[in-house]
Design a protein with these regions (language model features):
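Structural signature of nuclease core domains in nucleic-acid processing machines
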Residues: 1-78
Length: 78
């Protein structure tokens, strides 16, 4: 599709889990990247494809590369 696709999609019999992953150098950037990821999921309607599933779960998350953090520090269910 012209809308592209999410970074990671996991499907089970009844569920579709969609993840948009972003990378940030620090926590300030991570917050901005989370907003970007949420907007991207909504604008591109990730996961809303055929065949439909009973449950669609869409998650935006950001990996913070700061040496003191180095983990997924931001996330949001969309």
């Amino acid at each position: 599709s012209s809308k592209g696709r999410a970074d990671l999609i996991i499907e089970t019999k009844n569920r579709r889990l969609v993840f948009e992953l972003k990378y940030a150098q620090n926590e300030t950037e991570a917050k901005t990247k989370l907003t970007d990821a949420v907007e991207q999921i909504k604008a591109r309607d990730y996961g809303n494809t055929e065949p439909k599933k009973e449950k669609l779960i869409r998650i935006a998350t950001v990996f913070n590369a700061d040496p003191k953090v180095r983990k997924f520090s931001q996330f949001s269910k969309v």
